[in-house]
Amino acid sequence: LLAIINGLIHLNGIVMAKDKVDKTNAMRALDQLKLEYEALSYPCAGDEVLGGVEVAGLIGESASVVFKTLVTHSDNKDFVVAVIPSDEYLSLKKLAKISGHKKIEMIPVAKIESLTGYIRGGCSPIKMKKTFPTFISDKAKDLPYIIISAGKRGAQIKIAPENLQKAIRYQFADISDVEEVES
């Protein structure tokens, strides 16, 4: 079954981006650095926030390659960014240890936009308002590509980890768990 809805091609339930996706600041940053990536899009209504697993289904990818960007703060108010597979949970204990803090917790949702310049459900690790220490799940190391938010709901970036490394400074680390663990 082939259908075109909201300018997207739907083929047997898989959504494929049309040829032209509106550029985001994250995409422009990658273009400026001449880094290869693929822009993907999925249908998203207004303020609707979809989880990474749902997004993976909409773009026809495994949830293990669709990564979510999470922003945390430490006991001494340092901000730390974590990028993990959408089908996993952030281990606050592991992130605190690897980032050199005693304790880490998620920032309140209301602070995401003022801190990063991005909204919930559209937070990209690329081109945040400020540069924060960033840790990406070591599960990305051996993947040919990962998919991250492009900086707005409905837009994703498919990029090789080595190209992402050229765009932002990050460290691979064991920061996620398959099951939710109390921190």
Label for each model-derived stretch:
Residues I4-S183:
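Extended, low-hydrophobicity, polar/charged segments
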